[in-house]
């Protein structure tokens, strides 16, 4: 019997499913076993800090929550279609794998926004969150908060007094608290910039070919229907 070949499309799906599973397992474990704001010290440079945010990766926020959630869904759809085009055009495996990492990371945070407000009660510093009947949670659809937990204060020092605006203040690198999905997005983007710049130069051409193929397919279907 012939062994089933690992196609790039199948690899992309495996990466997406694996990242989503790991991300959600970590988030649900943290949310249902820690109080909001609770911190667990693993080493001097690695903590599990349970926080929630309404914004983008690493807690950033600069637009209304509902708009951000919709834009995330649009971005995931566009990247997903682009991965389909790259696979069909037999793009490099590493490029497809990194694209899958990025779209999986984005999808992981969107899942929080879509469903966590519907299936969990609100997190609190005084008690641990738990599952509730669907639709009776702390927020509406697309309005849930993203769960973050990884904190890596690798360098903790103080700005010299002569530094303008920051002199004498504490400096921490790396201060943002993030989750596994954020890490997958960041690692995917960095590796893509390092190893896939030539692949990225053809993004526009790939989309154009995909759109042209869609138009051609529709015209063919229309002609076939007229012939009938």
Regions flagged by a language model, labelled:
Residues 1-228:
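Alpha-helical transmembrane bundles and membrane-interface segments of multipass inner-membrane proteins
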């Amino acid at each position: 019997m012939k062994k089933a070949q690992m196609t790039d499309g199948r690899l992309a799906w495996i990466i997406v499913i694996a990242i989503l599973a790991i991300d959600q397992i970590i988030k649900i474990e943290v949310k249902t076993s820690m109080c909001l704001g609770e911190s667990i010290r693993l080493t001097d440079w690695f903590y599990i800090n349970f926080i929630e945010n309404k914004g983008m990766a690493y807690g950033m926020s600069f637009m209304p929550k509902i708009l951000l959630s919709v834009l995330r869904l649009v971005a995931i759809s566009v990247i997903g279609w682009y991965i389909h085009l790259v696979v069909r055009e037999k793009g490099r495996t590493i490029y497809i794998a990194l694209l899958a990492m990025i779209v999986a990371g984005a999808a992981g945070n969107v899942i929080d926004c879509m469903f966590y407000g519907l299936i969990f009660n609100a997190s609190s510093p005084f008690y641990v969150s738990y599952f509730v009947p669907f639709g009776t949670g702390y927020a509406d659809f697309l309005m849930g908060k993203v769960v973050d937990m990884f904190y890596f204060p690798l360098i903790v020092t103080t700005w010299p007094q002569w530094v303008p605006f920051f002199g004498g203040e504490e400096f921490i690198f790396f201060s943002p608290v993030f989750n596994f999905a954020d890490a997958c997005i960041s690692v995917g983007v960095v590796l893509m910039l390092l190893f896939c710049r030539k692949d990225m130069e053809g993004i526009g051409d790939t989309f154009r070919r995909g759109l042209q193929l869609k138009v051609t397919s529709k015209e063919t279907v229309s002609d076939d229907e007229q012939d009938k």
